[in-house]
Amino acid sequence: MVYLKSAREVEQIRQACKIFQEAKAYFTIERLLGKSLTAIDQALKQFIESKGATCAFHKYQNFPGFNCLSLNETVIHGIADNRVFGVKDKLTLDIGINLNGYICDAAFTVLGPKAPEPMQTLLEVTEACFTAVVEPQLRPNNPTGNVSHAIQTYFESKGYYLLKQFGGHGCGIKVHEEPLILNYGKPDTGTKLEPGMVLCIEPMVMTDSDAMVMHNNSWNVLTPKSRYNCHVEQMYVITTSGFECLTN
């Protein structure tokens, strides 16, 4: 069942999302480069707690970390460890924030200064998809399948592959709510968008294959047949006239 948020609830979720925006602005390449994933996770935790919030992912479905830190071959759900973010690396920071019971779930990807050019291009294309194809679909009465199909068409037209086993979702009161919004789909199918829906849209993109495997830690999702991958996640609320992006 889809839970529609009231204006008051949307404002509380908006405040949680502001902490994400502040974290994204604070954790620049200079602050991340040369640090272990564990150190980054702890620094993120301290930053979030300094804003009066908590880490929404910690212990959620028994997740052991505080945030999902996905380095290189890990596309999503990475558990922090002692590996170091280096000059040629990709790192996705998927941050869950619980502010007084209201949730922000959003992610951004950063690259070391010597990251390969194909990885740079992939990140640019992924970031651009939100304004290019996602946001034009975010309006009342438009079915979620149109959002999914727009994402699929956009990336496949550029020769990329999409992770099929995971997708976007409702959010705001719980980390994961209905509806599920996959990154592929058929037009005019799924749940119709309504004002008050809060949605996470999160393309997970690979350069060479849509194959994935689970790490033996049961969390890290790996892309062994793809040289590069990328994950970016934004949160939106559907309004009577269209949408508001809560995280950008």
Swiss-Prot record:
Keyword Protease: yes
Signal peptide (residue range): none
Function, in words: Removes the N-terminal methionine from nascent proteins. The N-terminal methionine is often cleaved when the second residue in the primary sequence is small and uncharged (Met-Ala-, Cys, Gly, Pro, Ser, Thr, or Val). Requires deformylation of the N(alpha)-formylated initiator methionine before it can be hydrolyzed.
Annotated catalysed reactions: Release of N-terminal amino acids, preferentially methionine, from peptides and arylamides
Needed cofactors: Co(2+); Zn(2+); Mn(2+); Fe(2+)
Protein name (Swiss-Prot/TrEMBL): Methionine aminopeptidase
Any GO BP annotation: proteolysis
Pfam families reported for this sequence: Peptidase_M24
Binding partners and assembly: Monomer.
Residues involved in a divalent metal cation 1 binding: D94, D105, E233
MF term (GO), any: metal ion binding
Record text on cofactor binding: Binds 2 divalent metal cations per subunit. Has a high-affinity and a low affinity metal-binding site. The true nature of the physiological cofactor is under debate. The enzyme is active with cobalt, zinc, manganese or divalent iron ions. Most likely, methionine aminopeptidases function as mononuclear Fe(2+)-metalloproteases under physiological conditions, and the catalytically relevant metal-binding site has been assigned to the histidine-containing high-affinity site.
E.C. number: 3.4.11.18
GO cellular component labels: cytosol
Family according to the record: Belongs to the peptidase M24A family. Methionine aminopeptidase type 1 subfamily.
Keyword terms, alphabetized: Aminopeptidase, Hydrolase, Metal-binding, Protease
Top-level taxonomic group: Bacteria
Residues that bind substrate: H77, H176
Binding site for a divalent metal cation 2: D105, H169, E202, E233
